[in-house]
């Protein structure tokens, strides 16, 4: 038994924790979840459960009803196998080979320098705990574990009709105990490609790298309204304000690592006249203090560095640089519109997530989210106009639908009544500004009744990710009670 497994055994008798410890021990970042999928398949077979896999790679496991519950509606428990691979710049970790190193920090479980994978590892562990249990009461159970949710919802897109028999789907990918979700935002990837021209580094120019790091980052849906800094946009702001006066020539812009994570770090390599280096140092320091004044209450660990950099490639031409920097500085980011119908919920947003530089092009990958297709289309149009003005190409891909709330949902009413019966108050019924797979499941299974719930997870998609221990116990209590209260199938 690992150190973590021994440690969490002291938390409670909750069967979720041993499964989560095992999940953490098997690398499973998006696009590299095969080892964990195979482990789960082999484990399920050892339990005598029926296991199937579709051509996309999704895993399906069936468990018969417990005695006396055979006449209940079938329930599909659903989670995704993959996790977001994010680490601090100074953390040495290969997500395809190295296990996550979780530990207990007071009331929370978190990880050493990396994302924890509680999103959606806790939900996945709850599905396995139901399959393993010989004690809880339930009707016919199916477990659906999808692949590649975080990097493109590949598994949900690939789900075909005829694979699931259940009437009700319980999605475990929500991140606030006390809230139950009945709707979510849709989204689309938007990638700019700027074709760039380069020329020789001017005589007398030296290299410097501007580094901005230490931002909180986080989930580009759930955290987009919190006012956190976007490293890509903050660096663009400095370049737009000072490149001309300092004669800065751009060599490389690199920032962010995932379209659905608010970028925490950005790195910009420039060439400039040696006589302007001291002025650059002054202005960059002054800009850092400005950002701390603006964002300091939210971004308590924001830091910048200016380092000498040996130049090994040419600089962008002045025209190429001007149109790229102007476009990036102009590009909208963050909350576009709040919902008029649901108080406190973001309706439409944009995250300028990842910027990469190659020899002859710069790519900027964004993620648009919206509760309404019309809101998504509006932002698509804004970005298309920006691309046209900047002479860039814009590719829109991977569009996925939102999950429209159903006020008549039977399982929602059952969850609400169950929750109130246990805790004496109703849960908050919510719509989430993030992409749950439920919206995609509605296409092959339009009559499936769905809700989403889970424990409290803070700062998902960032190395600060953590899950609150006591809410995992509450999550399990709710899962057990909900399964026992599934109605008889008509």
Give residue spans per PLM region.
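Active-site metal-coordination/substrate-binding segment of hydrolases
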Residues: 69-151, 156-167, 321, 329-339, ...
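Acidic/His- and Gly-rich active-site-bordering loop/insert found
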Residues: 2-107
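Acidic, glycine-rich active-site loops and adjacent beta-strand->loop/helix elements
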Residues: 81-83, 108, 144-152, 174-177, ...
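Substrate-recognition/cap regions that form aromatic- and gly/pro-loop-enriched pockets
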Residues: 345-434
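Active-site-adjacent substrate-binding region
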Residues: 223, 230-232, 236-253, 405-448
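Zn-dependent metallopeptidase/amidohydrolase metal-coordination segment
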Residues: 8, 13, 340, 347-360, ...
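Midchain, well-structured core segments that form catalytic/ion-binding scaffolds
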Residues: 27, 107-110, 150, 157-369
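His/Asp/Glu-rich mid-to-C-terminal helical/loop segments that flank catalytic regions of hydrolases
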Residues: 162, 228-245, 274-277, 323-329, ...
């Amino acid at each position: 038994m690992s150190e973590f497994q021994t440690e969490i055994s002291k938390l409670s008798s909750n069967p979720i924790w041993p499964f989560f410890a095992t999940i953490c021990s098997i690398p499973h970042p998006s696009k590299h979840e095969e080892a964990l999928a195979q482990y789960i398949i082999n484990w399920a077979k050892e339990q005598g459960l029926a296991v199937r896999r579709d051509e996309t790679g999704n895993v399906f496991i069936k468990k018969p009803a417990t005695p006396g519950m055979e006449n209940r509606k079938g329930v599909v428990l659903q989670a995704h196998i993959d996790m977001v691979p994010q680490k601090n710049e100074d953390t040495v970790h290969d997500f395809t080979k190295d296990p996550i190193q979780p530990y207990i920090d007071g009331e929370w479980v978190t990880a050493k320098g990396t994302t924890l994978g509680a999103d959606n590892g806790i939900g996945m562990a709850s599905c396995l705990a139901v399959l393993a249990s010989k004690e809880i009461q339930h009707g016919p159970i199916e477990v659906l574990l999808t692949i590649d949710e975080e990097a493109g919802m590949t598994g949900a897109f690939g789900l075909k009709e005829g694979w699931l028999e259940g009437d009700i789907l319980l999605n475990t990918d929500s991140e606030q105990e006390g809230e139950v979700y009945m709707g979510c935002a849709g989204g689309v990837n938007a990638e700019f490609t700027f074709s760039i021209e380069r020329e020789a580094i001017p005589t007398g120019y030296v290299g410097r790298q501007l580094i901005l790091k230490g931002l909180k980052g986080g989930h580009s849906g759930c955290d987009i309204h919190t006012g956190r800094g976007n490293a890509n946009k903050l660096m663009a702001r400095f370049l737009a304000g000072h490149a001309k006066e300092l004669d800065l020539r751009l060599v490389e812009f690199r920032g962010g690592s995932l379209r659905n994570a608010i970028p925490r770090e950005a790195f910009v390599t420039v060439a400039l006249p040696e006589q302007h280096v001291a002025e650059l140092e002054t202005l960059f320091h002054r800009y850092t203090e400005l950002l701390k004044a603006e964002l300091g209450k939210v971004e308590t660990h924001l830091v910048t560095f200016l380092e000498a950099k040996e130049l090994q490639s040419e600089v962008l031409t002045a025209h190429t640089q001007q149109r790229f920097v102007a476009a990036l500085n102009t590009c909208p980011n963050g909350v576009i519109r709040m919902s008029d119908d649901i108080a406190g919920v973001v309706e439409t947003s944009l995250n300028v997530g990842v910027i990469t530089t190659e020899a002859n092009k710069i790519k900027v990958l964004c993620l648009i989210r919206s509760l309404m297709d019309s809101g998504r289309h509006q932002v698509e149009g804004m970005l298309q106009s920006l691309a046209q003005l900047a002479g860039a190409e814009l590719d829109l891909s991977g569009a996925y639908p939102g999950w429209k709330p159903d006020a008549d949902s039977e399982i929602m009413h059952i969850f609400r009544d169950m929750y109130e019966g246990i805790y004496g108050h109703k849960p908050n019924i919510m719509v989430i500004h993030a992409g749950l797979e439920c919206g995609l499941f509605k296409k092959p299974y339009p009559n499936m009744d769905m809700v989403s719930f889970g424990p409290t997870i803070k700062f998902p998609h960032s190395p600060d990710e953590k899950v609150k221990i006591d809410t995992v116990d509450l999550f399990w209590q709710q899962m057990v009670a909900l399964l026992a209260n599934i109605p008889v199938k008509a």
